[in-house]
Amino acid sequence: MGEYIGDYTRKAMELFNFSSFRFQRSIVKAMGMVKYAAAKVNSQLSLLPSDVAEAIMKASWELVEGKLDEWVVVDVIQTGSGTGLNMNINEVIAKRASELLGRVVHPNDHVNMGQSSNDVVPTAIRVATYLEVESSLIPALTDFTRLLEDKAVEYGDLVKPGRTHLRDALPVTLGQEFKAYAGMFLRDTEFLKSALERIRELPIGGTAVGTGLNTHPRFGELVVEELRRLTGLPFRRGNSFVGMRSLTDVYMVSSAMKAIALDLIRLCNDLRLMYSGPNTGLNEIDIPQEIPGSSIMPGKENPVIVEASMLAAVQVIGLDTAVSLAVNLGEFELSMGIPLTGYDIILEVQLLSGALRQLGEYVIARVKPNKERMRKLAESSTALITMISPLVGYDKASMLSKAVNIRDALRGLGISENEINRILNLKRLTEPGIITRELGK
């Protein structure tokens, strides 16, 4: 195999030398699929000689398989249509196809036949996003949610103090908290799957401005049909005028991932607080650590995976902001934020998938509740006075909470010790009911 850098790519490398950012494997793979499908369809429509089409398809599939990745070298920061990426791909495929065929295959006349960067790259980033979310993020999210649900059952009877505004509140179980976390991510999964539905429509076949000039009328429809076959995913032919000028459907996927990131930060904050200590914090849970937490304090253990997951989530939120701005670039017939949108959204998928996997494996699966500590904290909560509020009124209960603990308050109401012990069954306080109505029963 030889050198597959073409003249356009060399010039693009010189001009778009902004960063070290290069397109991810999933985007290169999707571009290869689009080129494979285009060559096959152009051959079926008798527009491209079968031997040329066969060579292009073989070279395109090598790109899909990752065999030509080293030659996809253009910077992500480039012209807003993604022409740099499209031409880099065209030239790599053309040079490899020429090698396979034994004569010249042209990057524009043959590989790019019936296509424009303006419809190819928006199509590829939708395909890449759908593939990456379906194969990576949804499985990671599903496994993570299931793990939280399992822990909710396991910790169903472990009572701990509830807290609102970081102040004492009525007791809850650790299981109830984990069930709530699971519910958050279940909701996020539904949002993500709904957003995926929006990127099923592909604009391929619109060529330069959406009209489809210089392509066969059936080209777009047949390419999408082939992409369905290659991916096993439910793509359909969309309105090219819409899909080329607007990427807000892609942004919906980014927005769904931002929601996951926000809930991930929320969960991680609670885990850090429960793990705080061991002697000067809450110390309600223990999280076995794999590496030392400090380079100067011997024996110090820190929630390193929890914090790393939070950093990943923060980065996702930042990327979502970038995507929201990128999809708004452009005028009239074409979006001008296509390559950056594609790169950022795939990075969001990768970061979230990794964070969910690592947090699940190294934290959620290994959490060890400090049962006695949680029980003592729950029993000492000033909010327990809430249970006698229906009996003595809010104002008196409020005064009692500042003066005595709940046990003394109940004694002051003339309630026997046996009855007090029955009332102060903390597990009962985590369930619906009016405890004072049961006094004397």
Predicted region positions:
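Conserved, well-structured ligand/cofactor-binding cores
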Residues: M1-K441
